[in-house]
């Protein structure tokens, strides 16, 4: 009997706590509803105007990006074009590629998708065989390499597929996450939770991306043999 009494008492405590929590939620909702009821027509009109202004600004920004070539993944024809393209856009992802390198085609597929999704960023692809000066200046040694630029300056590099899980089968979401780590796109996910299906599969911990200085180092590209 004593055991049953303890259970009944425990159940009663839980029930009271649940009722108290429900009451708090109810009071909060009542308070929010009351606030809405107290908003006058002038205030509602002001909120509406602010919302419309924000929408107009966003649309204008979108049109500006599109006019500068954002929203599509494009090849640039010359080294001079590169400097002009980078100068006019705040965020740029630049894929240094070679036609004969298989992994470049893998990146092409993912970058074409991300270019349409992230209008805030310009996505370009110069052919390394047509841009020797540019490759020398940026010290591009591995093909493929993504140069990530902000305000005309190189902020980071993605060299080969090491940061993408060391696999050719990485997802578009994985590349998107990696670009987000360098703040070259507006990433809405959690940077501390990379979208790998299995981190152990790659034998590397990517939960915290370490900053690497790539400029000035020499690399060999096994992908050039493809």
UniProtKB/Swiss-Prot annotation:
Any single GO CC term annotated in Swiss-Prot or TrEMBL for this entry: nucleus
Any GO BP annotation: microtubule cytoskeleton organization
Every Thioredoxin domain range: 75-180
Taxonomy, superkingdom: Eukaryota
Modified residues (Phosphoserine): 188, 221, 223
Compartments reported by the entry: Cytoplasm; Nucleus; Cytoplasm, Cytoskeleton, Microtubule organizing center, Centrosome; Midbody
SUPFAM superfamilies: Thioredoxin-like
Keyword field: Cytoplasm, Cytoskeleton, Nucleus, Phosphoprotein
Matching Pfam families: Thioredoxin
Biological role stated in the UniProt entry: Significantly diminishes the chaperonin TCP1 complex ATPase activity, thus negatively impacts protein folding, including that of actin or tubulin.
Oligomer status and interactors: Forms ternary complexes with the chaperonin TCP1 complex, spanning the cylindrical chaperonin cavity and contacting at least 2 subunits.
Protein name: Thioredoxin domain-containing protein 9
Lineage per the UniProt record: Eukaryota, Metazoa, Chordata, Craniata, Vertebrata
